[in-house]
Amino acid sequence: MAVKISTIEVLILSLALLSFGHGCYGQLRLGFYSQNCQNVENIVSKVVGEAFIKDSSIAPAMIRLYFHDCFSNGCDASLLLDGSNSEKKASPNLSVRGYEVIDDIKSAVEKECDRVVSCADIIALATRDLVTLASGGKTRYEIPTGRLDGKISSALLVDLPSPKMTVAETAAKFDQRKLSLNDMVLLLGGHTIGVTHCSFIMDRLYNFQNTQKPDPSMDPKLVEELSAKCPKSSSTDGIISLDQNATSSNTMDVSFYKEIKVSRGVLHIDQKLAIDDLTSKMVTDIANGNDFLVRFGQAMVNLGSVRVISKPKDGEIRRSCRSTCNNPLCV
């Protein structure tokens, strides 16, 4: 007896097989694009490598972009969207950079795999490769993919921890994203290649908590060094390395933790990590250990899982990372 299969049943079966073969967007896994865009990671690595050769500071810039995107509304590339009131326009994001590198990667990927790879995954892969390059090739963590791009980007929704917060306040924000205290301490280790502007530390140098004096938790010698770089009367907002070990401030390593342990943290939150009861032992363990890079990689993977869009109706695969698919560019 012949079995009749309806058109709808065939369609459902086809979709099920497609999902089995390629994975379902929103369900992160390693090798998500292994069948429908096999060369994507090589393409990303090539473009990122060229960008790093031109300007190695793209590494900390991309780590920051990744963090700012994931932490506010989840890893959905909403930070990349242009608009008069998009996330880019929020005060903490005005100095974020790296967008052009993402554009270059997306353009190269689209030539090989049209509307397959999300911008959110491109950010995650590019950041991973730049961490590898900044470490001198000493680490390379595997990052699951399968993210969808978000459709909403609003400056009003940006919610990032301030460098002036206490450890407890910062930890609470991480906890809201299901990121642990351990994740927080490790992710702040990205500051080992980071920089900040003088404006963020002027209070620590000249008027800590309205005392008209420097922050007593900062090494006096460092106060002197930074005051010379960030004078009160300056008309420019200078740039300061967050890792004050001059020999390794451009290298992903454990030096940042060693510096904050001897009161040479630049940002308020960085220094507090080393002296707060919640985190001081973690800082000591990392500073004295040899597995920071491995642990940092795992924390970056955990960050990359924050509020990933799991329903296709809520996300999309953009053709341009700067605009949603409501835009003609997506046609």
Swiss-Prot record:
Ca(2+) 1 binds at residues 69, 74, 76, 78. It comes from the Eukaryota. This is Peroxidase 60. Heme b binds at residue 191. Disulfide bonds join 37-113, 70-75, 119-321, 198-230. Its EC number is 1.11.1.7. It catalyses: 2 a phenolic donor + H2O2 = 2 a phenolic radical donor + 2 H2O. It is found in: Secreted. Residues 1-26 form the signal peptide.
